[in-house]
Structure formats: structure tokens, C-alpha cells
């Protein structure tokens, strides 16, 4: 098949492009390089089935494709708060433009949504039928609300225009090709540990997250697109739950770093806990993560070690 990946030069997008090529598909990678990087897909450029286009999804484009994976959007607080208007426009206008294309060329389209649609959840773990406990005017809202609007658009294009949609909600994902200045906790802790800097925990370290290794996540994407039973939304994440302090200690042990852990005030709007219920993914997609946190961290640490060596 001919597949389009928006945000294809980003962390997740580059891994998805790689997987789709390995599965025998033709791949068009679309990216504006706001957070995506050419180096993430440089190893794919000699592949005859791979095409790279510099384009911003807030502008319309028409391509003949069979499948669209809509991943384009800054996904770390540092990046989406740097330009919040651009962030929400990318989610909303990007969804409108990609759905319009899917409608015209009759392509199946997947929206990479997020666990952030649940806000600071009052239900734990989060199931897909939970509507969330959200702040529409906070500093993270440009990302959270943009993704919620995108889900609404996907459902309405499906109901009104019969567009063939799929929606996945991504929980915290980590792995090689994360940006070093990403601002997300896994990359922060690893880079700080490798540089011998203090490891910064915001709050008292008791807030929890669930960390899914990138290969597991991409497998979930592929299974979601390849089945005809459900359109979603479906939670894709690792239900193993860790506190920030547990993660910091694990990183210190694996890196052998002498870094100290320091505590700083928790930013506003930061969810206290986040963990997916993946019963639907297990049942409908026969999917669950296979890579434990320790193994995934080891692979990610090797990546950042190589990066820091230059």
C-alpha cells in the first residue's frame, strides 16, 4: 500500500516510516521540521519506496495514498508551549486537511491522539469511555484541547462523510530518536545522568506515569490500521506504573551515574497520575506491550550515549 505519515521525521513518525517500509509499503513522509529532524529518516532516503516532502499540515495538500497516519504535532511541553497557537493549529487544521484528503482519495486515516485528553484524571486507570478531567485554559491546553478537537473532527467526518477512521490514544512513549532537549521525563533523566548533572524531579516524585517503548507503540498503530472491527478510540500504552522517583533511581542504576536527585516545584496543570486500561487493545487488536521498562531504558541510554559522544 501507499502510506502517508505526517510528522514522519519526528520521534514516533520515523519509527513508523521504518516499520511500514519493512512491511513492504510505499511511504511518503511529510514534515515541516519544527520538532522533526532530517537525521531521523536519513537512513531511509536511499530506499526507492520512500519519499520525503517538506510540508506543514496546516496547509492543504493532495496526495494519492491508501492510508494516512496523522502524527504531526509537537508532543512535549517545552515544544508545544514555545508556540501554543502553532500547536493547536497543527492539531486542528492538520486534522481538517488530512481528513479532507482522506475523504477525496478514500484513504483509511489514523489519528495519533493522546492520553492528555483525559487531563488530570479522576478515574484510574483510564478507560476509553472516560471523558476526562480537563483544563481548557491552562498552559498545556493548546496540546490537550487540540487533540480533543481532532478526535471530534475524526468522529464527525466518519459520521457525516463515512470517512474510514481509526483513533489511538498514546500514553507516554520513549526510545531512541527522542530529542535531547525534549523536556519529557525519560530523556531529561537519562541526559542529566549521563552528563553527571543533578536529576530534576518536579514535585515530591510521587506522581506516576506509564512508559511504553516505541517499538511496542508502533506495533499497536499497525494492528489498529490492519483490523476492521473498531474505529476507536483505543488506548495504546504500557499499563506498568512507575513514580518519578522510581524512574530516576532506575536511570541512575542503569547509567552508573553519580548524579544527585533534586526536587523542584511541580508546574501547574501537571497530571498526578496516568495509566492506561488496555483491555480494549488486548481484545480488539490482540495487542499488549512486550518490552519491560528496564530493557527499553537500556536501549534508550545507548542511543543518548552515542549522541553525547557526537
Protein language model regions, located:
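Nucleotide-sugar-dependent glycosyltransferase donor-binding/catalytic pocket residues
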Residues: 88, 178-179, 210-213
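A glycine/serine/threonine-rich, flexible loop-to-helix segment
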Residues: 124-125, 180-188
Amino acid at each position: 500500500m501507499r502510506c502517508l505519515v505526517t510528522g514522519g521525521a519526528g520521534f514516533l513518525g520515523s519509527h513508523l516510516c521504518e516499520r511500514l517500509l519493512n512491511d513492504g509499503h510505499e511511504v511518503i513522509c511529510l514534515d515541516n521540521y519544527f520538532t522533526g529532524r532530517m537525521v531521523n529518516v536519513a537512513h531511509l532516503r536511499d530506499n526507492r519506496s520512500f519519499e520525503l516532502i517538506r510540508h506543514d499540515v496546516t496547509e492543504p495538500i493532495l496526495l494519492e495514498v491508501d492510508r494516512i497516519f496523522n502524527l504531526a504535532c509537537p508532543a512535549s511541553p517545552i515544544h508545544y508551549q514555545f508556540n501554543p497557537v502553532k500547536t493547536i493549529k497543527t492539531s486542528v487544521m492538520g486534522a481538517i486537511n488530512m481528513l479532507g484528503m482522506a475523504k477525496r482519495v478514500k484513504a483509511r486515516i489514523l489519528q495519533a491522539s493522546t492520553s492528555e485528553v483525559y487531563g488530570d484524571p479522576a478515574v484510574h486507570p483510564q478507560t476509553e469511555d472516560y471523558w476526562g478531567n480537563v483544563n481548557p485554559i491552562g498552559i498545556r491546553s493548546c496540546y490537550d484541547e487540540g487533540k480533543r478537537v481532532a478526535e471530534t473532527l475524526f468522529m464527525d467526518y466518519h459520521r457525516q462523510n463515512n470517512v474510514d477512521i481509526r483513533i489511538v490514544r498514546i500514553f507516554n512513549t520513549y526510545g531512541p530518536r527522542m530529542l535531547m532537549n525534549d523536556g519529557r521525563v525519560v530523556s531529561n533523566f537519562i541526559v542529566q545522568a549521563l552528563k553527571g548533572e543533578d536529576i530534576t524531579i518536579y514535585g515530591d516524585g510521587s506522581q506516576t506515569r506509564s512508559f511504553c517503548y516505541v517499538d511496542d507503540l508502533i506495533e499497536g498503530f499497525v494492528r489498529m490500521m490492519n483490523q476492521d472491527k473498531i474505529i476507536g478510540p483505543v488506548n495504546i500504552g504500557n499499563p506498568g506504573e512507575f513514580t518519578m522517583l522510581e524512574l530516576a533511581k532506575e536511570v541512575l542504576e542503569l547509567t552508573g551515574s553519580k548524579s544527585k536527585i533534586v526536587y523542584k516545584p511541580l508546574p501547574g496543570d501537571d497530571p498526578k497520575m496516568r495509566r492506561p486500561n488496555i483491555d480494549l487493545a488486548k481484545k480488539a487488536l490482540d495487542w499488549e506491550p512486550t518490552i519491560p521498562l528496564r530493557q527499553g531504558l537500556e536501549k534508550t541510554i545507548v542511543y543518548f550515549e552515542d549522541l553525547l559522544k557526537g
